[in-house]
A protein has these predicted regions:
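A conserved mid-protein helix/loop that constitutes part of the nucleotide-sugar donor-binding site
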Residues: 11-18, 186, 190, 195-209, ...
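Membrane-proximal helix-turn-helix segments that form the acceptor-binding/catalytic region
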Residues: 19, 67, 122-142
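Glycosyltransferase donor-sugar binding loop
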Residues: 32-37, 171, 191, 216-233
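Donor nucleotide-sugar binding/catalytic pocket of nucleotide-sugar-dependent glycosyltransferases
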Residues: 49, 132-177
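Acidic anion/phosphate-binding donor-loop and adjacent secondary structure
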Residues: 57-58, 154, 164-186, 196, ...
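Short His-centered aromatic/hydrophobic patch
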Residues: 81-89, 107-108
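Nucleotide-activated donor-binding/catalytic signature segment of Leloir-type glycosyltransferases, i.e.
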Residues: 230-251
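Aromatic "clamp/platform" in nucleotide-sugar-dependent glycosyltransferases that forms part
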Residues: 268
Length: 282
């Protein structure tokens, strides 16, 4: 049994479910907060509900819940952990357990933790001793999506085990509707979680200052409650009221991306933006 661990079930449903489908000689268990139980059941042999608040950047009560799950897991089990945030919680949960796991961490982007935000810089300094003490004991492998993240995190954490570069999580191309022709009135879109380090403010300024009549700007995505870089509800309401920009909420990019002509990606500290790969294909 291979255990996939993430702090959000959508992480294990989107691209990772395709990997599970391809590796049909193995059984997979999802360990995450279960929101979309029906989707998880399509792909995973078993799903364990790891309760964690997404409204907190670090939900330390979730450490005890994950620790309980790890205690009930067989010695020598295989774990694949997704995102740096989940990796940190896994390290703490695994501390002093009388078990040895085969664990791999996928860093899909360094995100808020490596941003220029003052609070993030303080967090980074305070948590470094924990990474220095535990990262090599916990993870046999770390997978990165770009060399910049690989160099930065390995230097920060002094990670000495196996470091791998896999550029992008990939997409399943038959799932996407392809674009036949461009619109007469050009549609520009930025799609992703509504985080400040996704370049939302710059995109909004661009839409306000752009004066061509045949261009329309769209923004798609949800708030990421609990992420310190997330827009607030008040900021989102201001965007909704903005005449230069059309807010769409969450959309299914596999079915909807072909309706747009140009995609912007303005992210900082992104591993390899999945939406860029989707746009290049569509």
């Amino acid at each position: 049994m291979i255990n996939y661990v993430a702090h959000w079930d959508r992480i294990l449903i989107q691209s990772r479910s395709k990997i599970v489908n391809e590796l049909n000689n193995y059984e997979f268990r999802s360990i995450c907060p279960i929101v979309d139980d029906a989707e998880l059941k399509k792909y995973y042999s078993e799903s364990l509900n790891w309760k964690i608040s997404r409204e907190k950047y670090f939900d330390f009560s979730a450490v005890f819940r994950l620790r309980k799950i790890l205690k009930s897991t067989d010695n020598g089990s295989v774990f694949h952990i997704f995102t740096l945030k989940t990796g940190f919680l896994f390290m703490i949960s695994n501390l002093f357990l009388d078990k040895k796991f085969k664990s791999t961490l996928s860093v899909t982007g360094l995100g808020y933790f490596f941003s220029k935000n003052t609070s993030a810089k303080i967090f980074k300094i305070l948590l470094r001793p924990i990474f220095l003490a535990l990262v090599n004991k916990t993870f046999q492998n770390i997978i990165y999506q770009n060399t910049s993240d690989e160099i930065s995190f390995n230097k920060y954490s002094k990670f000495k085990n196996n470091s791998h570069l896999i550029e992008s999580s990939g997409i399943n191309t038959p799932d996407y509707f392809l674009k036949d022709e461009f619109n007469e009135n050009i549609k520009i879109i930025l799609a992703g979680r509504l985080l400040k380090d996704k370049g939302i403010d710059d995109y909004l300024k661009l839409s306000k200052n752009f004066n061509k009549q045949n261009v329309t700007f769209f923004l798609a995505g949800d708030l990421d409650i609990g992420n310190p870089n997330s827009l607030t509800q008040e900021e989102l309401e201001a965007i909704k009221a903005e005449s230069s920009l059309n807010y769409l909420g969450y959309i299914d990019l596999q079915k909807e991306l072909h309706n747009y002509d140009l995609l912007f990606s303005l992210s900082d500290h992104e591993g390899f933006s999945r939406v860029l790969l989707e746009a290049m294909y569509v």
